[in-house]
Amino acid sequence: MSTLLLVEAFYGGSHKQLMDLIKEEVEGCILYTLPAKKWHWRARTAALYFMQAILPSDTYRVLFTSSVLNLAELVALRPDLGKLKKILYFHENQLIYPVQKSQERDFQYGYNQILSCLVADTVVFNSAFNMESFLTSIKTFLKKIPDHRPKNLEEIIRPKCRVLYFPINFPDIRQYLPEHKCIPHNLVDKSSSDISYCPKTSIQTGRMSVEFSDHQIQCSIDESSAEQEKTTVSEKNNCEGVDHVILHSQSTLAGDIHQEKPLHIVWPHRWEHDKDPETFFKVLLKLKEKELTFHLSVLGETFTDVPDIFSEARITLGSSVLHWGYLASKDDYLQALCMADVVVSTAKHEFFGVAMLEAVHCGCYPLCPKSLVYPEIFPAVYLYSSPEQLLRKLEDFCKRPDIVRRHRFQGETERFSWAALRGEFRSLLDAEPREDL
């Protein structure tokens, strides 16, 4: 039996999600990993570690790895692995990583990724933005070499490149959804193949490809409000919160969130410089200065160096904070997302955005920069052009949180699901017969 060799030098976050999903869904996998710590050292030295860790086998046919690993080093150190079909997956690229000063950019990381592309058989990117920003930056990036620069590398690498969106295994969130996020069944196209139901109330929820305007939603809600009032008391929504409390109050976690409750903003990103937490918290502090009421959940993983703004903001925002810190339990994390109204990104470095799409799946209204990958993923209504525009949108939502709670996402998340992408991934990972094996 042929074996799919999975190698992940930074086994955490979306890197871990992808490897775990492939291992679970594709037969004949063997996985080698390094913990998601000290990213810079993983990028520098992982190949040497895997040279010794990966056991030799005649069954290997495909090697799948992320661009954290220097694939060129690994196949040079292990010629037996060089004979495999080598697939390199880019979650991010280092050629356009944001640094505060040009002198801070470490040339080696981007250079390693270019070398890895040259030895790979197939190079896969999680978005068109990721692919184009990488390929079109190669020439400029290599100008940092003082002389004798290599030529035409974009032309050499491009033919082996393709886009294959990150596959999200969207979970069943019905037990966590508050009532206002459950959609009356008469508003949903029943032909949609991606609709789930709250069993006790015949209310449909989940990822929808159907689009409704705010006006359509409001009219339908007004027409059915009397009937809903009759059923609300006698039939408890099956999407109410569970007993385990992760926020400050049981009332906040309960499924029956009334429209007058303060806007709940969630920030579910890594606590690092490239996610630009400074801009996010500056906007929230301005909301505070305007004496606007809101609740806040700051989630996401933390690593060795946490920006100072987090400790400062925690104190300043005080009673507005409902949850602060990483949630190791996926169920707790999904529960927190389901209780939020708006999910915000202020990223300066984003090539897909799993956290944003997961939050949208949980019924959050997304607000994203009009740059990076976001225009590729989200309709224009969810994009902002400046911190000032983000502030204005959040200010409006704080004054009228009911507008957000009535809104239904106007985009489509299903195309990013494992169900939609499974076939492409299986085809990608199929071994190609080789005479030299």
Swiss-Prot record:
Subcellular location as annotated: Cytoplasm; Nucleus
GO MF annotation, one: tRNA-queuosine(34) beta-mannosyltransferase activity
Cross-referenced CDD domains: Glycosyltransferase_GTB-type
Family matches, as Pfam families: Glycos_transf_1 (PF00534), QTMAN_N (PF12038)
Keyword Metal-binding among record annotations: no
An annotated GO cellular component: nucleus
Swiss-Prot/TrEMBL GO biological process terms: regulation of translation; tRNA modification
InterPro entries referenced in this protein's UniProt entry, alphabetically: Glyco_trans_1 (IPR001296), GT-like_domain_containing_1 (IPR051862), QTMAN_N (IPR022701)
Reactions it catalyzes: queuosine(34) in tRNA(Asp) + GDP-alpha-D-mannose = O-4''-alpha-D-mannosylqueuosine(34) in tRNA(Asp) + GDP + H(+)
Keywords carried by this UniProt record: Cytoplasm, Glycosyltransferase, Nucleus, Transferase
EC number(s) given by UniProt: 2.4.1.110
Keyword Glycosyltransferase attached: yes
Primary subcellular site in the record, as a coarse category: cytoplasm
Signal peptide (UniProt feature, chain positions): none
Enzyme class: transferase
Role, per record: Glycosyltransferase that specifically catalyzes mannosylation of cytoplasmic tRNA(Asp) modified with queuosine at position 34 (queuosine(34)). Mannosylates the cyclopentene moiety of queuosine(34) in tRNA(Asp) to form mannosyl-queuosine(34). Mannosylation of queuosine(34) in tRNA(Asp) is required to slow-down elongation at cognate codons, GAC and GAU, thereby regulating protein translation.
Family: Belongs to the glycosyltransferase group 1 family. Glycosyltransferase 4 subfamily.
The name this protein goes by in its record: tRNA-queuosine alpha-mannosyltransferase
Name of the coding gene: gtdc1
